[in-house]
Design a protein with these regions (language model features):
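Internal glycine-rich alpha/beta core junctions
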Residues: 1-82
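Glycine-rich cofactor/substrate-binding loops
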Residues: 35, 50-212
Length: 212
């Protein structure tokens, strides 16, 4: 049969690997911020030198095996492309290794991903704190659009907002505390009246279709 069928099958498994690798990366980033954590065993050790560490071992393993599976796709593509009238045996080693190992790797990453998802730990308090810190920066896009719709000069409004957001960000980095941007916007002669007409900055208004 055409080796294109081998490629099509492994390419589909490669798509699974891509999706689960993306999931593992996102989880590791969110865990570094403290929003999510993968499940941990009571006796699990993150580092022999640093007892406090809680490394995302499962997510790292998921990413590693997903990479392996993803890298099988171009090999099988080359195998299909270099066949001689479908009659040579120079594909025998790759077929025996790549096809079987790809299915084993796919099985492994699905099991690991399911294990992570079944025991995923969410820290709502950390999520709420980060939303409070970052939501004002997200909301200024809405403020800019409403200002333009009201007849304001886009470049002028953009520059005013840019300067205030940078000042607010710098203050948070150097002094800590809550995000001061809303108060800074309210005190601006042009942005303050626009802000007063805006709906409350409720997080739910900025999640798009995430709930779906």
């Amino acid at each position: 049969y055409s080796r294109l069928w081998d490629y099509r099958i492994i390419a589909r498994l490669g798509e699974l690997a891509i999706a689960l690798h993306k999931f593992s990366n996102d989880l590791r980033l969110l865990q570094s911020w403290g929003e999510l954590e993968e499940p941990y065993d009571a006796t699990q050790v993150g580092s022999s030198a640093m007892p406090y560490k809680r490394n995302p071992m499962r997510a790292e393993r998921l990413g590693s095996l997903s990479k392996y599976l993803m890298f099988q796709v171009p090999g099988v593509a080359a195998m299909a492309a270099t066949q001689w009238f479908e009659r040579t045996l120079d594909d025998s080693a790759l077929r025996r290794i790549a096809l079987t190992q790809s299915f084993l790797a796919a099985d492994a990453i699905v099991l690991i991903a399911r294990n992570i998802m079944d025991g995923l730990i969410v820290h709502p308090g950390v999520v709420e704190r980060r939303v409070r810190e970052q939501l004002p920066f997200m909301a200024v896009e809405e403020l800019l659009l409403s200002g333009v719709e009201a007849g304001g000069d886009r470049q002028d409004l953009h520059e005013r907002i840019r300067q205030l957001t940078w000042q607010a960000s710098e203050r948070m980095k150097t002094q800590g505390g809550e995000n001061p941007l809303r108060g800074m916007l309210a005190a601006d002669s042009q942005l303050g009246p626009l802000l007063a007409r805006q709906p409350a900055w409720e997080p739910e208004r900025f999640t798009g279709r995430a709930r779906e």
